[in-house]
Amino acid sequence: MICNVILRKSGENNYGGRPYSYETDLELKVGDIVVCPTVSGLNYGKVVRVDVPREEIDPRWRGSLREIVDFAPEG
C-alpha cells in the first residue's frame, strides 16, 4: 500500500509541510504516527492519506519510494 505522510517539524511536536509518499505493509489509518526514513535520517510522520493509487505517484519516483519503518512508540 502507498500512503502519504506529513513530517514532524524539526524540534517541534507538530506536523506540516507537503505530503510525502511511502510504501508500507502496515495496516495504517489516517492520523497514525509512524517512523519514516528521510534524507536527514529517521523522523516521525503523520499519515494523511492511505491507499494512494500507484498511478497518482510521479513516474520518476514510483520505483524508488521509501518504506515506513514502523508505528511510532507511544508517549
What do the PLM-derived regions correspond to, one by one?
Residues I2-G75:
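Terminal, basic amphipathic appendages of nucleotide-handling enzymes
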